[in-house]
Each structure stands twice: as structure tokens, then as C-alpha cells.
Amino acid sequence: MKRIRDVLSHENSNNTNYSDTNDTDYNDSHKLEKQYYEIDYEKFLLDSDIQEKYTKHIEYMLNKLLNKYKNKFVKKIIYDNLITNIINDFSDIIIDLSNQLDYVKQLTNKDFANKQIIDNMLIFLVKYEKILHSALARFVDIYFMRRLLDKKYVTNAVVYTGAYHSVTYIYLLSKIGFQMTHIVKSMVQSVAVANIVLNDIDDVSYRRNIYNLMYFFENNPFSQQCIDVSKFPKSFL
């Protein structure tokens, strides 16, 4: 995680291209990525060669997300609204996890028998599982939004995804002039109310009010995989 944060921070400050990653490195590491799921996990952790090639694969993908844009305006949108927030999020997460680790290290055996201490630790772990899930999901979001907005041949898009991804897409598109026009099976049925909520969100960071958008999806009694879009404009289909 620290490595990802450092790469993003370096690119954000210097805006330079990598010279040590190429398509050959990517192809090799992509094969190793698939191998990763087939080998013993401990072996992967102990094999420095596999780790190095896997890291190059990650850096190659990050380089694409950070530098490979045809439209400078799209690049600025993604940098300002997603990449900068990811850097800040990872920095905060690393600090929080480090502090928690220091706290755990100073606990005694007697402390571990204290139910309140254990409950607090479990609450922390559950909280950060969601935070990490959201932060890492945004790498997929950047890849998708870059492709959607930067490719001239893409005119329409149908996205089938979960709430963590959807809130980012909704947030980013609202920042460049898009508005919700149709809603199906959401806790917020009013298009006007939905757009008011969007206008009040100023940051996609997990510490900010991006999670107001999760209300669109959470505890939804209508949650189903299929929806009726027959009343949507033809361009949606």
C-alpha cells in the first residue's frame, strides 16, 4: 500500500513517465499475476523475483492511469477529483494503521482478556475493511472513467457494478456537468433531491461526505440485479 501511495505521489508531483516499464515487462508480470493465484501464498511472499515483476505490472498500470491521456481536460478532472484524493486517503490509512499497530504492540496479555479492548479492535478492523475496499475500488474507477471520457469513440456506456464503484462514477460525472435524469429502485426516488445531494458533495475521500451517496443503495428494499428501463430514453439502451 505504501508503495502504491509513493508511486502516485511521485507522479502527481513530477508528472513524469516511467522509463523502466514496457509492454514486455507488463506481459511477463501479467502472466505472473495469474500464477499468483495458483501458487502457495507464502511462496509468493518469499519469492522476491515474483514480487518484483508483479510490482512492475502494478507500476505499468499506474503509469497508464496517470499519464496516458489524449485529452488534457479529462486528465485534470481525474487528477483533481480522484488521484489526489487517493494519495491523501492512502497517507491517512497508513498513519492510522501504523498507530493501531503501535497500540496493539504495547498491550499486555491481561489487556487481550479485556472484552472492551477486543471489541474496539474488531470495530476498527471492520471499519478499515470497508475503507480499504473503497480506496482500492477507486483504481478500477479511474481506469473506467479514463476510458469512458478520454476515448472519442465511446458515446454511451452501460455500467453494471456495485455501490462502491457507482458512487464514484456518479460523483465524478456530476462534477463535469452531468445530472441524474432517471432513477429506478433507489432509496432516493426524486431526481431533484438526488441532484441536490450530488451538489453538496465536494470530495470523494472516504473521510468526506461521499458516503452520503451510499444512501442511494444501502438498506434498499428494492435491491435486485435486474431493473426495468423501458421508460428510459432510447439512448440509454
From Swiss-Prot:
Taxonomy, superkingdom: Viruses
UniProt region (Disordered), positions on chain: 1-26
Pfam families: DUF5847
InterPro entries per record: DUF5847
Compositionally biased spans, kind Low complexity: 12-21
Similarity remark: Belongs to the mimivirus R160 family.
Name of the protein: Uncharacterized protein R130
Protein source organism: Acanthamoeba polyphaga mimivirus (APMV)
Upper taxonomic lineage: Viruses, Varidnaviria, Bamfordvirae, Nucleocytoviricota, Megaviricetes
